[in-house]
């Protein structure tokens, strides 16, 4: 699979306007009255996937619902700037869910900046900037000397060992969005700029600093999706394991070599391909997900093609959200393109050493 050139724009018709509205309405039906967006009715909410779904609502024009989701985050932020790993209706889903994952806590910065780009709502930006600031300060307590982020604080307050490449790439994206918000607020954050430079360098140049999760497709494409790897390096990264993870006509494996393609990973790869200047390939991947679309506009999580079986039998808001965001980028949504192209996001300062 050649990746040596930028492609012409993607063909139209990724999702129709009616299909987009139907999917957004389906996410809205799962959203609770307090603004929280769980995976599906009766299941837990986690902060990262909650933000993914909120961004999808904004991309579909459901700005009031998206704002309610961000207000939920503001109300549930812990005093130290963190959020718990998972929530039931009235608090952490289990005692173990009192852990805090660094990429979960960083990601609201991406959503808040996306919502401001989508709406221009200055009151919202002013209200949410302190929330983002507290979250970033929490996350950066876990940055290691090599630039990578420790992935989790356990419920007893100790830092879990190890760093995750996908999580660090996601947090690098979030840190750049947080810097953009700081610029809008007129509050320079030089420490964040240094942290962003070190974190991006670790993701690009030091895979040995991360736990080996190379079986998972997210570790393959996420540095491109997050904007940490761009240009020829992005094309080379995507080409290197394309045949391991992409199943022609079906989508993207979640885990290699399992015969299981998943909607979330497929849509995220499509978004990464668009960001890398490969919209036709992105469109081809996104169109594979038609088999996972349900009558109400939601998407099944995955398909085991060896058994011709939908599995698991769940329809998650974050899968639907990823599809809407990929479609929004392909069809020209300004906020989504700005956030995921990364072209105008602050880059941080390069580290003094490697």
Residue ranges and their predicted role:
Residues 65, 124-127, 131, 191, ...:
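Alpha-helical positions within canonical tetratricopeptide repeat
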